Amino acid sequence: MNVFSEIKDAIERAPRNSYVAELHLQVIKFAEVLENVSGKEFCEKVDLKSAWGTEFTKMKKIAKRLRAAGLDPKKI
């Protein structure tokens, strides 16, 4: 399974009221792999509306700071 499929599956399995939180967690978890992926490409690969590209970009930036502070993304 590729990273985009894994993210899409996780988002689809999330409870309706946790959809956005799951999206954020998945981007943080896979931020290093997604480093060179644009918001547009991410949305296309995960079948999200293009507006989610902004959230994707924000979470990639936050992920760098979280990793620098000691977060282990493998535990997400």
Predicted regions and their residues:
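Short, Lys/Arg-enriched anionic-surface-contact patches
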Residues: V3-K29
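Short Lys/Arg-enriched helix C-cap and helix-to-coil transition segments
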Residues: K60-I76
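Short alpha-helical "recognition helix" segments of helix-turn-helix
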Residues: K40-V46
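Major-groove recognition helix of helix-turn-helix-like DNA-binding domains
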Residues: S50-K64
